[in-house]
From Swiss-Prot:
Pathway: Porphyrin-containing compound metabolism; protoporphyrin-IX biosynthesis; 5-aminolevulinate from L-glutamyl-tRNA(Glu): step 2/2
Summary of subunit composition and partner proteins: Homodimer.
Principal location: cytoplasm
Reactions this protein catalyses: (S)-4-amino-5-oxopentanoate = 5-aminolevulinate
Localization: Cytoplasm
GO aspect biological process, one term: protoporphyrinogen IX biosynthetic process
Lineage: Bacteria, Pseudomonadati, Pseudomonadota, Gammaproteobacteria, Enterobacterales
Taxonomic superkingdom: Bacteria
GO molecular function terms noted in the UniProt entry: glutamate-1-semialdehyde 2,1-aminomutase activity; pyridoxal phosphate binding; transaminase activity
Source organism: Salmonella paratyphi A (strain AKU_12601)
UniProt modified residues of type N6-(pyridoxal phosphate)lysine: K265
Keywords: Cytoplasm, Isomerase, Porphyrin biosynthesis, Pyridoxal phosphate
GO cellular component: cytoplasm
Protein name: Glutamate-1-semialdehyde 2,1-aminomutase
Amino acid sequence: MSKSENLYSAARELIPGGVNSPVRAFTGVGGTPLFIEKADGAYLYDVDGKAYIDYVGSWGPMVLGHNHPAIRNAVIEAAERGLSFGAPTEMEVKMAELVTNLVPTMDMVRMVNSGTEATMSAIRLARGFTGRDKIIKFEGCYHGHADCLLVKAGSGALTLGQPNSPGVPADFAKHTLTCTYNDLTSVRAAFEQYPQEIACIIVEPVAGNMNCVPPLPEFLPGLRALCDEFGALLIIDEVMTGFRVALAGAQDYYGVVPDLTCLGKIIGGGMPVGAFGGRRDVMDALAPTGPVYQAGTLSGNPIAMAAGFACLNEVAQPGIHETLDELTTRLAEGLCEAAQEAGIPLVVNHVGGMFGIFFTDAETVTCYQDVMACDVERFKRFFHLMLEEGVYLAPSAFEAGFMSVAHSEEDINNTIDAARRVFAKL
């Protein structure tokens, strides 16, 4: 047995499923998950000494690559001053100033510890500010594991939520309305059915949890218009897309102004950080200045703030996002070309430093139904054959891939060459 196999066997006796987040268990592709020893640049190194070109990037945060010296040094320096104070620090102010400067729609920002905390808190704030209970989310969009967001979508334009996790009361989930991503008709139907009851829409501007599905040109502006028409708030969940699709996020890339924005992943530089913010009048409703409660023992942790501050300063340097886009485009085009040569039907969506691989006969993938029609079994075989080639992709057909500026042209070429060999076996 490999060391990863031995560790996984031991972990399953001590940790549910052997992992601390379900997708890591390889249940989406089968087999034994890799246990990682270290990472540097664009590479992961497992406990058995094998190296992999990494396109997971810790599920998004590692836009600069692993073990970036500026972030590492910032963490070391901060740790020497103490690990946690439970009191305000200068770095929290500097971090808030940097974030609000980089994302102009955020007049104010509150730091939290994860993307889930950010979305959960933003939705509570929207409900408190509007005095309404219902929210709209979209099929295939994931916003963390808060109860109100763990809702299954059925067929049809509008579904009154049924929870898709035990432990979520149906009476609570009923306030979550699920609409079809990239379909404004379904959203209007929800508003017309509940014109005075919907507090907010929450949306991934690029859906990254049904692989990678960009918005149609009219979709995000249409959501903004519907929120304005019916008096609801628009929450854009930029946990994945923030500072990656563009410096000011997908909202800037697509030209839409939200009322609230949720951030995570890159904002922490690899440390556990989330944030939410937006219009000053809405944020003023948050405790301690307003009645909507939110708190966190480790929110604004000094080490996490130092890591995030260092990361964002690097990400803000000229040329970063152009490089991300060029590398991702080169990878996407190369994979499609290699698949076509092998007679394999393939679509690769990509926006900025995000991409998604779909085995499908369709020409485009634009919604949840398109994603679910893809060949998941072929993806599983592709994943494992690429792993044997030393390429680590997301271990699920429903998760986006992530590029970093640490990836080189040689890494991209080697990945395409590996895919060409793998396609010949599919």
